[in-house]
Amino acid sequence: MRHYIDRDVSLNELKPCNFSDNDQFLNFTNRLDRRHWYSIGAGFLQRYYDNPFSEFDLDIFYLRLKINKKIKKVGTIAFQMDRGTAKNISFQKTAVSSDFDRSYETIEWYVPVKLKSFISLFDHVGFSFRQELRYYKAEAANDILHSGRDHTDSKLSFWVDKELWDDLSVIVSARFRSRNTDSAYEWVRDLKSFNQTQLWCKIKWGFSYDKY
């Protein structure tokens, strides 16, 4: 009698897909004039998954350009563009499923707006729109899930903040997300497309510690 652990993919049992991000970013900022400034940067993001999803491990290299504008007595607005390449570092190195290449190219643009609130209940209000276009590199005919697939991921966010005391503030946010997937297979389009609403509250507490 031998004891085995069933490692096969199950259609009924779901597994948590946990991952960690380690983002390293180098940025240069310079002023254009009194109300305009820009930033240029490059980053390296390591996105590694826990078992049994380690075949999705990615090293992501990206470049970023951001232009900011201050509007007198109103607030600020910015435009940001990212261009990145994700390399599937576990491709053909772990389980059988790692024979499928999850590498992709990505382009993302982002427009955040921050305004002074005209309601005394809040200090600032803001909104932003972010859209990512992702193109998978997979060409294997047997990798139906990724081959020839791309998607557009759009996020519309709103937020308000309020400083309660000098060292305590609250931010309440809402985000509406929509992903539209394009594939030659209808079931892939249905599986990887979704709409999502997120609500959250962030409490920020700042303090200083001096030791003489």
Model region roles, listed by residue range:
Residues M1-Y212:
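Gram-negative and organellar
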